[in-house]
């Protein structure tokens, strides 16, 4: 049976290098499942695969969207499944790698009946965001869908806006639409989770932020100033440095805040993944054990 190997884990854990080794061993391309790496021009701040890595193994869904493009987990589900179907005509195994929780769920179990948002609703919500601010939209979401309000990151503009749009468009709750029965896939799914001891993970995150700064993250953010209102830039690493360029924060403070916010995001990812009992967990250094496990289960 065709098998989709899903390599997941928190940001900074070491998915990229292991995904390359796995893809080479399996002789397959990589489907990126990091929602921010889909956007072009966010190479440094999202730790997107380098040009050399992209040459080493074929990737899908890296740098394919413009910053102002609207994109959702439901659209990713459609695009990824189309790509998977095409690739499975040529091979029996594929690798999907990333840490975007909702995008992984979209491919593995589907997002049922999420309505297409009309231009009227999208424009209305966008205008309210500009006029009233995120807090007003968050309170509206609390009224319409208190369950999702309780779990959503209240500072994540994209998720609050999308959930509110769905509520307004469907007349129901985003929670109900997300929690319907999983869709059945015509391929097997093998989930591999990567994790490290908490202190080790946090040290890697801190070091990676320092490395991003040394490789020009501030210059990347400066180039993106004309697009700063794009949802894609409401992302750790970018929003903090915009405040530096605005003269609100010193650089040292912003760098420390990026590290802290990245660590918080990693904890949220792990909390989400821990609810999935189908994940087999490994330390990233256990590369041979991971490869053996995959080969045993895709044979």
What is each residue range found by the language model?
Residues 1-299:
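Phosphate/pyrophosphate-binding catalytic cores of soluble transferases and nucleic-acid-acting enzymes
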């Amino acid at each position: 049976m065709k098998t989709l190997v899903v390599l997941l884990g928190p940001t900074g854990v070491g998915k990229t290098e292991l995904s390359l080794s796995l893809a080479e061993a399996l002789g397959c391309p990589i489907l990126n499942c990091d929602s921010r790496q889909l956007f072009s021009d966010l190479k440094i701040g999202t730790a997107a695969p380098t040009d050399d890595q992209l040459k080493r193994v074929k990737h899908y869904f890296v740098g394919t969207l413009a910053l102002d493009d609207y994109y959702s987990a439901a659209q990713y589900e459609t695009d990824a499944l189309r790509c998977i179907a095409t690739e499975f005509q040529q091979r029996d195994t594929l690798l999907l790698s990333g840490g975007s929780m909702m995008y992984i769920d979209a491919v593995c179990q589907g997002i049922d009946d999420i309505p297409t948002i009309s231009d009227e609703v999208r424009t209305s919500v966008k205008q309210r965001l500009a006029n009233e601010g995120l807090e007003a939209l968050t309170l509206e979401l609390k009224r319409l869908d208190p369950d999702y309000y309780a779990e959503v990151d209240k500072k994540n503009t994209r998720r609050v806006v999308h959930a509110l749009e769905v509520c307004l468009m469907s007349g129901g709750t985003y929670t109900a639409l997300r929690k319907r029965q999983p869709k059945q896939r015509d391929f097997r799914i093998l989930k591999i989770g990567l994790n490290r001891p908490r202190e080790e993970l946090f040290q890697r995150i801190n070091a990676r932020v320092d490395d991003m700064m040394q490789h020009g993250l501030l210059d990347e953010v400066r180039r993106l100033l004309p697009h700063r209102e794009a949802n894609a830039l409401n992302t750790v690493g970018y929003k903090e440095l915009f405040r530096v360029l605005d003269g609100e924060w010193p650089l040292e403070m912003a760098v420390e805040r990026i590290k802290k916010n990245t660590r918080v995001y990693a904890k949220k990812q792990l909390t989400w993944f821990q609810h999935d009992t189908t994940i087999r967990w490994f330390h990233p250094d256990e590369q041979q054990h991971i490869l053996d496990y995959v080969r045993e289960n895709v044979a």
